[in-house]
Amino acid sequence: MATAYHNLSDYDYESVPCGKDLRIGIAVAEWNHNITEPLMKGAIDTLLEHGVSADNIIVQHVPGTFELTYASAYLAEQHEVDAVIAIGCVVRGDTPHFDYICQGVTQGITQLNIDGFVPVIFGVLTTETMLQAEERAGGKHGNKGTEAAVTALKMAGLERI
């Protein structure tokens, strides 16, 4: 979580396993694309930096954050990936829609992690304002996509222990 004391893009480089032989899926919501595209770029750049081949990064765009659960399951089952990163952004509005979407995608991704054998990483920003999202998509709090990619590499490495 980004706070005044922690930047999402700060991590111990040496603690991240090499991704040379890994295949990573990335499910990306198109909604709030001005946020999700920089998140995706942060994830891809980090994966490449840690040895994942560009050919082994499979990106699937979906209309919105709610669809990330389905896309993540699809990537895990159809593309034989070692981990999936779900990237989305939900900003609170004037209706309860925010709560329904956040709860649905959180429960969906949790269920995929319980039922499946491919780790699905929660790279979804749930913010009160667009400014908060921007600050976590490459702004002053770093990039949640970078954090999600590091988590994916570490979780994919669990299978190799």
From Swiss-Prot:
| Keyword match S-adenosyl-L-methionine | no
- Residues bound to 5-amino-6-(D-ribitylamino)uracil are W31, T65, F66, E67, C89, V90, V91, F122
Going by the UniProt record, its keywords in alphabetical order are: Riboflavin biosynthesis, Transferase
What is the catalytic activity of this protein?
Answer: (2S)-2-hydroxy-3-oxobutyl phosphate + 5-amino-6-(D-ribitylamino)uracil = 6,7-dimethyl-8-(1-D-ribityl)lumazine + phosphate + 2 H2O + H(+)
Record's GO cellular component terms: cytosol; riboflavin synthase complex
- Coiled-coil ranges from the UniProt annotation: none
Say yes or no: keyword Lyase present.
no
Q: Copy the pathway line from the protein's UniProt record.
A: Cofactor biosynthesis; riboflavin biosynthesis; riboflavin from 2-hydroxy-3-oxobutyl phosphate and 5-amino-6-(D-ribitylamino)uracil: step 1/2
Its Enzyme Commission number? 2.5.1.78
Q: Which residues cross the membrane?
A: none
The record's InterPro entries line, in alphabetical order, gives:
LS, LS/RS, LS/RS_sf
Gene3D superfamilies found in the cross-reference section: Lumazine/riboflavin synthase
Q: Name one GO molecular function term.
A: 6,7-dimethyl-8-ribityllumazine synthase activity
User: Which amino acids does the record list as binding (2S)-2-hydroxy-3-oxobutyl phosphate?
Assistant: D94, T95, R136
Q: Name one GO biological process term.
A: riboflavin biosynthetic process
Q: What class of enzyme is it?
A: transferase
Q: Where is the active site?
A: H97 (proton donor)
NCBIfam families linked? lumazine-synth
**Entry function:** Catalyzes the formation of 6,7-dimethyl-8-ribityllumazine by condensation of 5-amino-6-(D-ribitylamino)uracil with 3,4-dihydroxy-2-butanone 4-phosphate. This is the penultimate step in the biosynthesis of riboflavin.
Q: Which family does it belong to?
A: Belongs to the DMRL synthase family.
Please state what the protein is called.
6,7-dimethyl-8-ribityllumazine synthase
Native source organism of the sequence: Porphyromonas gingivalis (strain ATCC BAA-308 / W83)
Question: What lineage is this protein's organism placed in?
Answer: Bacteria, Pseudomonadati, Bacteroidota, Bacteroidia, Bacteroidales
